[in-house]
Amino acid sequence: PHYLYESSLRFMSLLAGHFDDYITHLYEASNSIIRRDTSVCYFDCTNYYFEIETADDDYVDEVTGEVSSALRKYGISKQHQPSPIVQMGLFIDAQGIPLSMCINPGNHNEQLCATSTEKKMIRSFRDKRLIYCADAGLGSMDIRRFNSFGSRAFIVTQSIKKLSNPLQKAVFNHDGYRLLSNNMQKPLT
């Protein structure tokens, strides 16, 4: 099929306006092809830098005065680049298939992206039980609190070196573990 570049840009604007509906449709349609395992969901956030001189200016609506934040903003870059960045967060299911994503200006806190994207994603699921898995940078108290309600839980990595002595001892303790199948104690070997 032949189509104009301008047509694809117009389509992108239309798609952006219905992004959440489209993601829900993709989830449901793919679930009919391959059973999606959303019992464990992994989230991570990264950023992309642009080799430009200045960040984008925010857009101010002349009629309403509403300010829309531009995407390419100065923020903390994982590549340590002194360039404007855009942040992207991605949820994947237990098989590594993407579930949802968010794109935010580079100067936004990535932890806010996690909870807002998860709330949207949960609305798409029939089975609301899930375990949120992320690295330590995405395990704030607010995120852990959010994932302690309902039938949600969380696993967030933590540096063993930064733990208190009693917790370090507990981590390396080989006793006190129980099998889920029959609740019998089983030492780690």
What do the predicted segments below correspond to?
Residues 1-189:
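Anion-binding and metal-coordination hotspots
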